[in-house]
């Protein structure tokens, strides 16, 4: 599967912005079946968030969507830098260290047997 620079008549060329062909990721592989919530791995249908959660009450949230190809996170260091910067901008403390976040990402990839898809951090 080849990465191609995104470029069409309506947008300027940005060498750091890429897209995958439409058939590269199917909906089935993009949806996780095992999630990580509040320190626990669980089936997605068991995941719950407290009604007192600040993100739920006030909409405070930072997220990153990380691409997985052949079971590997693509440009994960870039995602982690942006995550760190974004958390700092809104004064939210990271619940885990960056090394722990990477461990969770890798465990989610393994638990979901994810070859191609997405890992969504929020």
Feature roles, as predicted:
Residues 2-122:
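Conserved alpha/beta cores of soluble small-molecule-handling proteins
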């Amino acid at each position: 599967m080849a990465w191609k620079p995104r470029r069409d008549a309506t947008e300027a060329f940005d060498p750091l912005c890429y897209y995958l062909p439409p058939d590269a990721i199917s909906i089935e592989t993009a949806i996780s079946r095992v999630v990580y919530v509040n320190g626990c791995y669980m089936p997605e249908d068991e995941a719950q968030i407290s009604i007192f959660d600040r993100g739920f009450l006030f909409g405070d949230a930072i997220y990153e969507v990380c691409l997985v190809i052949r079971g590997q996170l693509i440009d994960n260091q870039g995602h982690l830098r942006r995550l760190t910067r974004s958390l700092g901008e809104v004064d939210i403390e990271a619940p885990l260290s960056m090394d722990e976040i990477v461990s969770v990402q890798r465990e989610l990839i393994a638990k979901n047997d994810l070859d191609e898809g997405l890992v969504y951090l929020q």
